Amino acid sequence: MKLIVSLIILNLGYPLTLESTLFAENFKKPLFLCPHPSEKNIFFVVEQGGLIWKIKNKVKSNKPFINLKSKVHKPIIPGDERGLLGLALPPNFSETKIIYVNYVNKKDETIISRINTSVFSEEILIQFKQPYFNHNGGMMAFGPDGYLYIGVGDGGSAGDPLGNAQNLTNFFGSILRIDVSANSGYKI
């Protein structure tokens, strides 16, 4: 994929200039920057240790927007891929104040949950055990079809020793698509 993108850029016929600018700072193990679905000046930063920070007009809030530190597995070794791994805001986030998160809990289980940020109530939608400390995935996003897409890693270790990515009887090595439009639970 990188090669294809590089070839496309080379064939543009004009030089490409990239500029690095500071957006916000002072995060611990930031993994993801999630834009607000309807307000262009608001973003959310996901920290692996369990915090989600709100950034408005390039200014970090004084307090975390969401604190899941008591729920997530704290990464304890270099390369540890557990903790808070993903965040998705639905298109109607401004009205519902509901977010979706992907994290590995202290029991080494992947949790996909819906959180009402107005009252901080969490509903676990999907839960399954992780066999290793890495290859857990984490990316989540809403598609133009309104479904929530969830990237699930092969469960680890190096080389996928359990063959999870080829096994259709589990979630590993998959992109899940779920309908979260109901008030509780989800549909496939």
Question: Where do the PLM segments sit?
Answer:
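Beta-propeller blade signature
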Residues: 111-119, 164-181
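Short acidic, Gly/Pro-enriched loop/turn segments at secondary-structure junctions
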Residues: 181-188
